[in-house]
Amino acid sequence: SIIWGVGGALALFFVANMVVEQFPDDWKKRLLPFIFVGPAIAILAWYLLIPVLRTFYASLFDAKGEVFVGLENYIYAFTSKAMLESFRNNLLWLIVGTGLSVGFGLLIATLADRADPVFETVVKALIFMPMAISMVGASVIWKFVYEFRPPGAEQIGLLNAIVTGLGGKPQAWLLVQPWNTLFLIAIVVWLQTGYAMVIISAALKGVPAELLEAGRIDGANELQVFFKIVVPYIRGTLVTVSTTVILFTLKIFDVVQSMTGGNFGTQVIANEQYTQMFRAFNYGRGSAIAVVLLIAVIPVMYYNLRQFSRQTEAF
């Protein structure tokens, strides 16, 4: 499929270019942008715009898509107990997940940048390694970490093995509210810290040594140099990394579905959408929740693209 796709695109552009070459120069300049950008816009419209419009249309109808109900599904999306719980949990994911991922990424990148090059490479490889694991795969790994067995039984879960080894009682970590949501967030922090570390590390290496030395000569200690020179200098990168992780946490689904199925107070927006559409078979409500999630993601995505564009222009 890759060969056919790439080959087809090359053939399309080659033939289109041959056709455009037959026109006068003035027409060439007008037609070339449409020739090269047009197919991409058409594909995006077919696979993105049309499904969005169909989803919005479906959100205005009842569960079976037969009776027009107007904004009733949206009222449910903003007032039902399940959705209010989902909004609360998504906000927790957004604040804690993003804060810890970027914070740990910045900390590790800063410490590794000061270490021996060989040690730096090894540490970065180990921290980045979880990024190669799928969300479901990571969930399976962490299920063994949080595994619970009744008191007296052999604890195969790492966390409970440590707790019982220290004389404590085993806990059903994924059932304890509201801490279970934080235990799920820990999985994404484990996954996203590597991404944040790599991007921030590249930005740190771009900080001019002369700037750091000037700060030290002026009497600034290392903490002052870091917070008053380094952090402001890489602010754009920190914002870009943060918004990228925010997008990820807003759409979080795999971890929650794999670990708890949204039960025990861990429901999130994307999982509630899945529940309504594929368990309750209420396509109207599911579509409305999908639209709400899309509206929540668009401003962050737009801001992220603006930041990326500014950084590109700076170079």
Predicted regions and their residues:
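Transmembrane alpha-helices
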Residues: 1-26
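Short, Lys/Arg-rich N-terminal segment immediately upstream of the first membrane anchor
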Residues: 23-27, 228-231
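A structural signal for multi-pass alpha-helical bundles of membrane permease subunits
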Residues: 32-315
